[in-house]
C-alpha cells in the first residue's frame, strides 16, 4: 500500500534531499515560523503520479544538522525546533523525515536565518518569499509594540474634539450615577480616566497617543499618524453601478470629526440598522428578536476589537463592510494571539492599552479577551455560519455571518443543500445510508452530491470502511468554539443540578 501525500501548500513543503541536506530547508523553517507553521518532509519529492518517497542517505545525520543549526545563535535568532516535532519514518527501506515547525509568538518574529534579519521569510501559497523592508518593520513593531500611552509634546486639549469628550463624559456619568462627572473640568476628567499622563521628566501632564486617536481632531491625528484612515461601506445592495448605499470615511468633509470614538458610535448605529438584511424567513428559520440582538452583540464586539487591535503605524486603512449576508472587518496588523485563543477567549494581547481602557470604561468592551468568544458563541447558539478569521501579510480580516451555513453558499445545487441541511440538523457525523434515505434520493444521487460537497471543502469524510461517516469540515477556530460551548453547557447543567 502506497502512502498518500497532500499537495504542497501554505503548511506543507516537500524536499528531495537525497544526496545532501538542502539549504532551502532554512528558508521554509523561517517562513513557517513567521506564518502559520507547517510540515517539512525531507526525502519526499514530486513524481509523475504525485508525491513519492525518494529517501535520504542518513536520517540521523540530517536530524543532527537541524538540531545543531537551530541551536546556533549565530545562525538563527530563534530555535523553533523540538525533538518531539521531528519524526523519522521508513517505507520500503527508504528513510524520510517529517518535521513540524510551529508558528512562533509575535514577540519572536521575524525568525531569520544565516545571522541576517534580511533573511526573514513568509509563506505564500506553496513557496517561501523573502520579506521586504516594510514587512520586516511590521513584524518588529509587533515584537516590541510602541505603547499608545506614549506622551505627546506640544499637544493640548485644543487638539481634541470637545464634543466627543463631552459625549464620553455623559456615558461615564450614566454608568457611574453616584459620581458628579459632568461638573469635572475636561482636562481633569481626561487625567482621571486614562487619556492624559504625567511626564516624569518635566512633571507636566500630556496627552497620550491613544487619547489623540480616540478623541482627536482629524488634522491633529494625521500629524502623528499620517496614514490614519477609517472607512465604513454599506454594500447590502451592491451593484456595479452603485458600489455602496452609505459610507463613513475619514478625510471627507462631514459635520463630525472622524476619530475612534465618533467612528465607533456612528458606524455601530448604521451596522445595527442592517441586521435584518439577509435573514431568510421560512417555516424552519424564523427571525427572532433575540437573534437580532445577539447579532448586534457580535457587531459591537467586532467593531471594538477592530479599533482596539489595529496597527495605527501601518499604511493601510481600517475598513468595515456590510453585505447582504455578512460583515467584514479588516484592520492593519496581524493578531497577537492565535485564532484558537481568540475564539476560546481568555487570552488578550492588545496593541493599544490606552484605547482598550477608554473603550472599556465607556462600556463598549467588557473584560479582556472575551470579544472573540462572544462572537463565536452567538454564531453557535443561533446556528449561523461560523465566523472566519484570516490573519497574515500584516492584516487581520474577520467575517461575521448573519445567515446559516447552507444559505451562505450561493453555488450549491438543491440536492447538496438538502444533504448539508440534514448534517447540520443532526449535529453529528452521518452514514451514507442515512443520506440515501432522504426523500427523493438514490444511492447515485447521495454519493455524487456528497462527493461534490467534499470537493468544495464543505463536508469531510471520517473513518474507513463500515465506520465511514460524513460531517462538516471544521476549521480550527470553530473546533475551539465548539469545545468552549460544550464546556459551558456542562458547567451550566452541573449548576442546575446543584440548585
Positions of PLM-derived features:
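Active-site helix-to-loop segments that bind/position phosphate- or nucleotide-bearing substrates
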Residues: 123-314, 322, 330, 336-348, ...
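Short amphipathic alpha-helical interaction segments
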Residues: 440-452
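Short, cationic-aromatic polyanion-contact patches
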Residues: 464-486
Amino acid at each position: 500500500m502506497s502512502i498518500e501525500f497532500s499537495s504542497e501548500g501554505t503548511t506543507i513543503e516537500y524536499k528531495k534531499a537525497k544526496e545532501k541536506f538542502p539549504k532551502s530547508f532554512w528558508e521554509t523553517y523561517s517562513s513557517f515560523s513567521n506564518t502559520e507553521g507547517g510540515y517539512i518532509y525531507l526525502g519526499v519529492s514530486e513524481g509523475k503520479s504525485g508525491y513519492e518517497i525518494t529517501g535520504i542517505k542518513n536520517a540521523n545525520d540530517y536530524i543532527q544538522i537541524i538540531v545543531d543549526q537551530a541551536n546556533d545563535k549565530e545562525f538563527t535568532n530563534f530555535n523553533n525546533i523540538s525533538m518531539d516535532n521531528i519524526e523519522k519514518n521508513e517505507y520500503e527501506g527508504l528513510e524520510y523525515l517529517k518535521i513540524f515547525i510551529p508558528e512562533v509568538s509575535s514577540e519572536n518574529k521575524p525568525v531569520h536565518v544565516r545571522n541576517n534579519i534580511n533573511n526573514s521569510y513568509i509563506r505564500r501559497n506553496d513557496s517561501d518569499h523573502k520579506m521586504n523592508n516594510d514587512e520586516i518593520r511590521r513584524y518588529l513593531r509587533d515584537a516590541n509594540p510602541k505603547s499608545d500611552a506614549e506622551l505627546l509634546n506640544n499637544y493640548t486639549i485644543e487638539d481634541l474634539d470637545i464634543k466627543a469628550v463631552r459625549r464620553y463624559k455623559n456615558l461615564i456619568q450614566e454608568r457611574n450615577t453616584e459620581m458628579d462627572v459632568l461638573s469635572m473640568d475636561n482636562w481633569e476628567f481626561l487625567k482621571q480616566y486614562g487619556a492624559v499622563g504625567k511626564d516624569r521628566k518635566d512633571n507636566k501632564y500630556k496627552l497620550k497617543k491613544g487619547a489623540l486617536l480616540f478623541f482627536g481632531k482629524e488634522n491633529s491625528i494625521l500629524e502623528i499618524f499620517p496614514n490614519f484612515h477609517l472607512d465604513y461601506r454599506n454594500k447590502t445592495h451592491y451593484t456595479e453601478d452603485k458600489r455602496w448605499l452609505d459610507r463613513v470615511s475619514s478625510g471627507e468633509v462631514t459635520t463630525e470629526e472622524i476619530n475612534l470614538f465618533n467612528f465607533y458610535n456612528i458606524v455601530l448605529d448604521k451596522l445595527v440598522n442592517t441586521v435584518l438584511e439577509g435573514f431568510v424567513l421560512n417555516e424552519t428559520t424564523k427571525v427572532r428578536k433575540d437573534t437580532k440582538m445577539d447579532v448586534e452583540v457580535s457587531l459591537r464586539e467586532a467593531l471594538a476589537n477592530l479599533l482596539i487591535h489595529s496597527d495605527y503605524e501601518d499604511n493601510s486603512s481600517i475598513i468595515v463592510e456590510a453585505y447582504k449576508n455578512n460583515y467584514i472587518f479588516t484592520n492593519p496588523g496581524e493578531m497577537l494571539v492565535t485564532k484558537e485563543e481568540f475564539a476560546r477567549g481568555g487570552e488578550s494581547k492588545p496593541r493599544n492599552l490606552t484605547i482598550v481602557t477608554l473603550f472599556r470604561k465607556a462600556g463598549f468592551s467588557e473584560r479582556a479577551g472575551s470579544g472573540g468568544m462572544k462572537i463565536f458563541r452567538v454564531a453557535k447558539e443561533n446556528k449561523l455560519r461560523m465566523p472566519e478569521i484570516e490573519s497574515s501579510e500584516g492584516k487581520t480580516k474577520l467575517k461575521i455571518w448573519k445567515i446559516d451555513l447552507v444559505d451562505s453558499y450561493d453555488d450549491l445545487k438543491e440536492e447538496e443543500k438538502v444533504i448539508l441541511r440534514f448534517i447540520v440538523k443532526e449535529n453529528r457525523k452521518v452514514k451514507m445510508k442515512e443520506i440515501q434515505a432522504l426523500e427523493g434520493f438514490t444511492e447515485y444521487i447521495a454519493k455524487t452530491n456528497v462527493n461534490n460537497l467534499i470537493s468544495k471543502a464543505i463536508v469531510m469524510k471520517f473513518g474507513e470502511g463500515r465506520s465511514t461517516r460524513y460531517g462538516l469540515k471544521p476549521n480550527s477556530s470553530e473546533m475551539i468554539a465548539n469545545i468552549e460551548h460544550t464546556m459551558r453547557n456542562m458547567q451550566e447543567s452541573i449548576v442546575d443540578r446543584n440548585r
